[in-house]
Structure formats: C-alpha cells, structure tokens
Amino acid sequence: MGLRLATFNIENLMSRFDFAGFRNALRQDRALSIYQIDDQRQYEALEAARAVATTDDTRQLSALAMAAVRADVICLQEVDNLEALDAFERHYLYRMIGRGYRQRHVSRGNDGRGIDIAVLARDETGEGQRIEIRDIQTHAFRTVSDFGLQSSELAEMGVDGGQKLFRRDCVVVDMAVGGRPFTLVALHLKSMGPSRDPDIPGREWTMPMRRAELAATRQILTDKFDGGPERMRWAICGDLNDYRERIVIHGEFEEEFRFEHVREADSSLDVLLEDGFAFDPTQKLDPMQRWTLFHSRGPGRRHLCQLDYILLSPKLAKANPDAVPQIERRGQPWRTIVPPGQEVERFPRTGWDRPKASDHCPIALELNI
C-alpha cells in the first residue's frame, strides 16, 4: 500500500505586502533600491506593483515543482495563511496542473513574520487508497519548561523556560491510509542566523534552539506512543534548517568549479539520527546528490546542503529498505551551481536568480504503509 510523501519550503507564499523595506534597507527589494523614492506612499505603491508583477511566474514555477513530485501528502513551509494557500491551490495547482489537494491545514505558529506550516493531502493515494486525516495537534503554545529543556546555552541566546519552544510549530497529524494508521510530524526549525556574537557563526549560535526543538519533537513522539515510537509508523517532514554535511564550492564565475564534500563535526540532527531514533533515507543517495539548497554569500562563501528532510521511524524504515528520495531541482534558478552530471532542464521562464520555484528543492519519498 503506497503513500507518496513530500516536503517543500515554498518560500514566502504571502497574501500580505511587506513594506518594511521603507524604513529598513536590509528588507528592501534590490530592484527598488535602484530608484529614488520620495516618500512612504510612493514606496508602498512601487513595492505592491513589484510584488504583483513577479508573483504569477513564481507561483507557476512553485506549482510545477509540486506537481513534479506527485505527492499524495505534502508538508509546506513559509505559508502566510489558509487564504493564501487556498488561492494557490485553486488557481495554480488545480486549474493549471489539473489535480489539487482537497484536505488543507495551516498552523498558526510563532514565527515573527507570520510564515507558517501547512499540510495538504489528497482524498486518495495514487493507488486509490483513501487518505483520512483524523486529528491534528499543534504544539506552538508549549514552552521550554514544559519539556524540561532549560539550559545555559538557551539562556545565553536569551531564551528562558517560559518562552514558547518551537520557533514556528510542531504539527502532529494522525491519519489513516487505506485504513492503516500513520502519523506525520511537520516541522520548520529555527533558522541558522543571525548571531548576536560576531565571533560565533550563525549556525553555531542558533544550534541550541534547533537541538531543543528536535529534543521536544522526540519527547512528543515518545509520549504519544507510550515509550515505544520505534514500533509505530511515523515520519518527520520539513525544513530542519541544519545539515550534517555540505558541498563546498570553490572557484569563480565562468571558471571551472571544484566541489568538496565536507562532514560537519556537530549537527542538531544528531538528536534524532545518532542513536537510530529516526532514519534519513537520503543517505541511500550519493553524498554529492543529497542537497536541497544552494547557499551563496558571494565568492568563497558558497555551498550546497540538505536542509529539507523526510525522516522515518525504525518500523517504517525497515518496511521500506529500497525507498530512495526524489529531489526535484528543475525549479532552481540558473545561478545554482551544481556538480558535474547534475545539470537539469529548468522549467520554462526560470530566471538567473528569479523567478524560481523556491530557494529550496522539494523532496519526495514513496512509502509502503
């Protein structure tokens, strides 16, 4: 009995205009930075026009990327609200692609920008098995002390026991696929920056927060399944904003690039993976093929890494020994530098930097439930 599961950071699926760039140059779009803008009213009119002009191409590409992975159930990150998701599903996924998702849920989480986690499901799998969402639980309201995860590292970040733990949410979805129970955990963890200490990189500075989020996720699953989560069918999906390895890119524009595979000494993902609590099926891919994001801060600061994951319970991993993830890269912008042999034919109208489907690649996995 097959279920095709996917996760995708859709990158700012917004229904609101963001006018913060008028007072904060770091938030201003680069196109507007070229022009002399006299007042806030003019800025807001120009920003609204810019956003509307670019949205259609961007969301066509997002829909193409989602359609390409053919998921029965998909977790999305960076969704503004249910209204934005409904409009995208109706006008892009359904009308443009021809097959949509009738079951849709958006969590109202803790993100300061209001970007939330969404879960979409079809009524049936591709094999015709009914998908029934039976319960959805949010953990956005739970605090650090609820999980007993207070620490000196979090205190140094300014996080005390009374603060909400999840930067967005931990959404637990209980469903039945062809009558068989399956639990999906949807996450979007704390980002890797910025750092408040100029001597500590953003990833290192923020890692205690992601460790705590994953430790809490582990507690939630352990409590839910009475101390025996290894015996149950569950998967963790989402943008976990950390990596255990990366591909460092050496070279300059229009030169021959060199790619160096680097293992990281420490990762928040170790909380789930180090002792076999969960399994990462992307490990079946070649190390040079696991990446889902191209990171660039200019020459000498470029790498490819995996931030997006579908992690399986021991029971589900054992039942799917040959399941290999599909990473869809045709919506990546042309500026993404890829290792030899990984070139793909981009979707039509993909730009050098934009429009693009997202800065992330969707990842999908066919599972035997």
Language model feature labels by segment:
Residues 1-96, 103-116, 161, 351, ...:
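N-terminal, active-site-proximal structural segment of metallo-dependent hydrolase catalytic domains
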Residues 2-12, 181-198:
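Active-site-proximal beta-strand elements of phosphoester/diester hydrolases
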Residues 11, 79-80, 188-190, 240-243:
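Catalytic metal-binding/acid-base residues of hydrolase active sites
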Residues 20-24, 89-93, 200, 249-259:
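Short secondary-structure boundary/capping segments
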Residues 84, 113, 193-195, 243-247:
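Extracytoplasmic/secreted cell-surface and envelope-processing proteins
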Residues 82, 165, 219-235, 240-369:
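Metal-dependent phosphoester-hydrolase catalytic domains
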Residues 58, 62, 81-84, 116, ...:
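Stable alpha-helical elements in mature extracytoplasmic
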Residues 73, 79-189:
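Structured beta-strand-rich core segments of catalytic domains in phosphoester-bond hydrolases
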